[in-house]
């Protein structure tokens, strides 16, 4: 009993310390967004004893930068690319987990799909830019949607393949014995059972697409297609960095 009573405070303090350690950068960023430039660079740092200001938020949302436009662009690009990647990758993952292929072709296809995700995006950004320039897609949201979808499909394929392999084939076979089709059993039985996998995979795709910066800089030029990551980068110039704006 004494040992258990001793463990509880230790566990609680460990959790509190972990939370503070994890949240400190975020909380400090929030405090920076309310500081004037002089207080941002004050030494020693001022964590609480500063005069708050909304200057950076006004500059971000209502002054010179169309931040709401960038938010809408990011939302459109992220949501559409995630939906497309989920549709294509889920079907591909189902195919690799259920269908038969000649010889070792299935493993070659699976490795090829995985290898496309191994490449750093910076390796293919120039060919992609030339390709999109040829078709007049540079500075459009469609270019970002295609790029993000292409890079998320391998991830979705491998994630959903592993989830489908954990679902017994007998469930589909019994449904098809009762007269259902392959796609019918996939839609009515497999997909509902794979909802946790779809949810986890979609969250990862949303995060990857929302935070992507390289293609957002290379493939967009104006506010018509600029995203949030590009807008944040506007805070860094040749001579200074507007930390208050970027924190806001």
Residue ranges and their predicted role:
Residues 2-248:
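A structural signal for multi-pass alpha-helical bundles of membrane permease subunits
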